Amino acid sequence: MLVLSACAAPQPKPVAPPEPARAPLDASYDWRVLLVAPFGSVLKDVPLTLHEVLLFRDEAGHAAPADELECYAVDGARPRFVARSPSEYLLCFKHDRLSRVEATVQLPAEEAVRIYADACGLWLKKPVGFGEECAGTDGGITFAGHFENEPDESAQLTIQLDAAEPADSAPER
């Protein structure tokens, strides 16, 4: 006698399709695009036309106090950063050598949190959530990014790059 038996199993639940892969970030999300000259470069060797700006700040914890730095803004085109032209782009020198770069970009409020998280995740080489610290060191350069909401409902992302080695001890070029 031949016996057939079968198992009854519930219908498999439909599996949601995976989320489509996100497009790679624009190359301008990498903070290295802001380095138009190596840290330690002499002011006259920077390949841009610059004008001096006066900074008035009350900040603590930076590599060099603001009063020790001479900062310059660029006359003309600025390097694109997070797919935008920076509203502020400063090259700061200590003892006539490049020691800090700072850039600020305006972000649309509805995309600001995502852009900040994407950029910071790229810089730190790991996913980050909004509000997490976005600072580190890479290749002898310290970086710190921060995000601010503006009263007009826009947002801005600022990054500061500092030479890990003091500019006044950089090798002669």
Question: Which functions belong to the PLM regions below?
Answer:
Residues M1-S5:
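Sec-dependent bacterial lipoprotein signal peptides
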Residues E110-R173:
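A charged, solvent-exposed segment within the mature domains of Sec-exported extracytoplasmic proteins
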Residues C7-L122, A163-R173:
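Short helix/turn-capping signatures at newly exposed starts of structured segments
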